Amino acid sequence: MRKATNKNWQRVTAAAAALALCAGVLTGCGASSSTAAGSTAASSAAASEVSSEEADEMAAKNVADLIDAIYVQERNENTDAQCEAAKAAWDALTDAQKEMVEGEEASPEYFGRDTGDASKDDARNQDNIGDNEILVVSFGTSFNDSRAADIKGIEDAIQAAYPDWSVRRAFTAQIIINHVQARDGEKIDNMEQALERAVANGVKDLVVQPTHLMHGAEYDEMMEMVDSYRDQFESVAIAEPLLGEVGSDATVINADKEAVAKAITAEAVKTAGFDSLDAAAEDGTAFVFMGHGTSHTAKVSYSQMQSQMNALGYKNVFIGTVEGEPEETACENVIEAVKAAGYTKVVLRPLMVVAGDHANNDMAGDDEDSWKSQFEASGEFDSVDCQIAGLGEVADIQQLYVAHTKAAVDSLNG
């Protein structure tokens, strides 16, 4: 982005003056006053042009600063006003100015990227909760279509299974909460807000159902927050994440992991147009599920999912992670594993509850470091296709969450 500094201003006005002087020399010093007027106009036009460019840059920088101010993990007393101000400033920009927005985290995509219809979602932040609440806790996503299909899909399934309970929502990522609020005007509770709402509404029995995959860092933080509110309720139960207990090493698998492995593989095979996984294998097609990865000890869950796929005889299904933790799940290692197994076609699909930023960019993006690009760049495969769909929209996965919720509800009565 070209900056119009004071030196630029001086250079331009000096150049304009020089042009005016040249014009005077060429027409003679005794030229009429119209020559002088023309020179002044040329100088003013040049100065005006720089001034306009500076104004564009200042307007774009203002929006970038406002976006960076709300791209934070902590909510404060100014957050609502900051979100509103950022959107108002963005809306006031011209299309050209919007393309100039660039900050530490800010870019034109923050407000400008179309991620679907936010009105299809339900923030589930209503009062009048009643005595019994199921609080569904998710990391969150700013991708509207995925939020409605994946997170709302899980919440709807739980609400259908428990019509006498009030299902409410909390996100743990304040950055995402702020993004959705600023761009779409949808206010989603963070954990503290959701728990305070439950207390204010006189909730007696609270069940917390995380949509997290595993007992990782996000789960631990959620537990700490819930523990700090336990004495505000008559009873509290926390349900299992999707993959259930972690286990001690990569060989440990359980009923949850088996159910997830079967559900996601069946969905991927069907979406790819095959009658069976074996038919896909005969076609030379491998399925690669890309998770997030973590440095938390729960990262062994990804290795366990690969063990589970192997135990089921799913020889053309591979597990990877964006972060490359565990090490064998790094993209380059998965590429080598698929290549060594002799498959010539690859289908990539996220091993994530939502198909958000990681699925759209890290997996299926056009950048050279996306998984799609890396598989293609290896030169080992005839085709690399992507299925951009989160786990949350899969009906069988939704029912696994319902089963975990049921176990937690039953524990309150036991």
Would you name each region that the model predicts?
Residues 1-16:
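Bacterial Sec-dependent N-terminal signal peptides
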Residues 24-28:
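C-terminal motif of bacterial Sec signal peptides marking the signal peptidase cleavage site
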Residues 30-32:
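Bacterial signal peptide processing site
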Residues 34-53:
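Intrinsically disordered, low-complexity serine/threonine-rich repeat tracts
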Residues 49-114:
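Beta-rich interaction/scaffold domains
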Residues 53-58, 105-347, 352-414:
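Extended amphipathic ligand-handling, pore-lining, and cofactor/metal-binding catalytic surfaces
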